[in-house]
């Protein structure tokens, strides 16, 4: 082999070895939190539901968990904790046109942790270094908790500007156990990563507050439950790109599908359909018919569970109607490829499955 070619070959080989040794950010979902689960809540804003109190309950539950919402992966120096994931959407007269409000996301959490481990910690941080990095970000005086206290409180949510948030984050990180010694560029990037989450969190909460607390209550035929399920199916399709993806769908509604787009006769008007069903089997077939006509089918690549809060209820629901309503939705869920269970409390829905 000529000397020039040999020298070029050796240079390429050395460069390849060096590049291979550079730590890479673990950007793929389900790497740092392999059993994480995406959660989406649907709140019915019709007169039959109390969406204001439902959102207050869900909001309070989320605020109580915010300090530990970023969780912790299984790494030396850390106590593993599952992160919080929460999106919220509305059931109204045309639910399928409503986009979910993503308040806090597993993907955002994993991106921040990947940055902390790979960029700040150098790829394989020691146990002591990992503990210090954790304290700088999520400890009692860490940057994440300080920004939470400044911008997100029980009743008041402030959406900070990028420059304002990053300035506060920079001042905090300069006092850190480890972050005070990193390069200015890494500290600057850290402020951007943390503030992106804080801004998304505050923006999501403000949007949800506007939708469920101050927004007008829907009157008339405005429980497009099937449209909400279509939105959930679209979320599942997006998740199917990720290996081992999980999704929990929590629906707070009386589950009496009714919207301006449907007639009062036929299977789509749930209340009339079950009242006109002689048997439980007939009610189940009505639910299957709606599922078939809706064109909804959930991806088998995603592990999905459905939890319903408040199905039926009210003075008009005797035991026979309740059984027929259960049969109706049992037929529907089976036809779209899912099973469901009923929950008594919204704040307990979709809990315990993200382990």
Model-flagged regions — what are they?
Residues 47-85, 105, 111-116, 121, ...:
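…and closely analogous acidic/polar surface helices at protein-protein or active-site interfaces
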Residues 78-110, 351-354:
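Acidic helix-start/capping segments at beta-turn-to-alpha-helix junctions
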Residues 120-244, 257:
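Von Willebrand factor
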Residues 35-52, 205-216, 307-312:
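Acidic/histidine-rich, surface-exposed loop or edge segments in extracytoplasmic proteins
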Residues 11-20:
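Bacterial N-terminal signal peptides
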Residues 42-46, 247-258:
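DG-centered beta-turn motif at the end of beta-strands
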Residues 21-56, 109, 117, 353-355:
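Acidic, polar low-complexity linker/tail segments
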Residues 53, 256-321:
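VWA/integrin I-like adhesion module and closely mimicked acidic/polar interface patches used
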């Amino acid at each position: 082999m000529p000397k020039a070619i040999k020298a070029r070959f050796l240079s390429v080989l050395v460069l390849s070895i060096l590049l291979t040794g550079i730590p890479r950010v673990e950007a793929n979902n389900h790497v740092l939190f392999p059993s994480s689960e995406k959660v989406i809540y649907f709140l019915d804003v019709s007169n039959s539901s109390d969406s204001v109190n439902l959102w207050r309950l869900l909001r309070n539950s989320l605020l109580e968990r915010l300090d530990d919402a970023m969780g912790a992966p299984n790494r030396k120096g850390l106590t593993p904790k599952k992160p919080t994931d929460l999106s919220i959407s509305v059931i109204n007269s045309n639910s399928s046109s409503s986009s979910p409000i993503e308040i806090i996301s597993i993907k955002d959490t994993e991106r921040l942790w990947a940055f902390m481990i790979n960029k700040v910690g150098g790829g394989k941080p020691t146990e002591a270094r990992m503990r210090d990095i954790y304290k700088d970000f999520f400890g009692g005086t860490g940057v994440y908790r300080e920004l939470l206290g400044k911008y997100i409180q029980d009743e008041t949510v402030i959406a900070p500007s990028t420059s304002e948030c990053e300035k506060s984050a920079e001042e905090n990180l300069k006092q850190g156990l480890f972050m005070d010694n990193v390069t200015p560029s890494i500290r600057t990037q850290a402020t951007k990563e943390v503030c992106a989450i804080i801004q998304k969190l505050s923006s999501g909460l403000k949007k949800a507050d506007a939708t469920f607390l101050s927004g007008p209550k829907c009157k008339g035929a405005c429980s497009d439950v099937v449209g909400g399920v279509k939105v959930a199916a679209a979320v599942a399709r997006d998740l199917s790109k990720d290996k081992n993806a999980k999704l929990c769908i929590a629906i707070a509604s009386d589950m009496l599908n009714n919207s301006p787009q449907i007639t009062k006769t036929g299977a789509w008007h749930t209340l009339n359909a079950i009242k006109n069903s002689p048997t439980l089997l007939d009610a189940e077939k009505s639910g299957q018919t709606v599922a078939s006509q809706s064109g909804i089918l959930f991806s088998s690549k995603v592990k999905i569970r459905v939890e319903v809060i408040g199905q039926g209820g009210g003075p008009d629901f005797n035991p026979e109607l309740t059984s027929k309503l259960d049969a109706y939705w049992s037929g529907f869920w089976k036809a779209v490829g899912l099973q469901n269970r009923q929950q008594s409390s919204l704040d307990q829905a979709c809990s315990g499955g993200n382990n």
